[in-house]
Amino acid sequence: KWIGKQILKNETTGHGTYLFGMEESYGCLIGTYARDKDAISATAALCEAAAYYKQKGMTLWDAMIAMYEKYGYYKDAVKAIGLSGIEGLAKIQSIMETLRNNTPTEVGGYKVTSARDYKLDTIKNMATGEVKPTGLPSSNVLYYDLEDGAWICVRPSGTEPKIKFYFGVKGTSLKDAEEKENALGAAVMAMVDKMM
């Protein structure tokens, strides 16, 4: 979110170089040619990748599988819980505040290694207690880095009476990643059930 604003910040402060940004529901932005996500630059990049891999005798599918084999199989999902009315809004706020004030130490067998609070602009290292700023715009979002490349992100929807739980895992195969994703999803929902 707010990718163009982050590009401008990098350009005006001289800190950082923007390469790529994305939003899970609305695409990606490659380079600084535009200030918002568009299909044109994404399509151009995909065509460039297809041409590159064709010269190597590979399809995009082959390249994707090679990346999975090299870096791991990543799977992510989202669970949204609808809570309408004044009571629903209060429950969403309560869940966010409960998580903000009581960072989980473990979810689904994964140890929480760091906790990011974008509303408070903090990243806390759970092992050392060290806190540093996120450096990103303020937003009511909590993000937990877990062991083994897993993660959880929680935020209220900006357009609907829902709270959303995003989560992801890294596996050694597609089957392993799917099993881990299902297990972490069940653990996230069990954690939420305790707060309902």
Annotate each language-model stretch with its function:
Residues E160-G168:
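C-terminal charged capping/lid subdomain of soluble metabolic enzymes
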Residues K1-R155, K162, S173-E178, G185-M196:
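Phosphate-binding and adjacent anionic-ligand microenvironments
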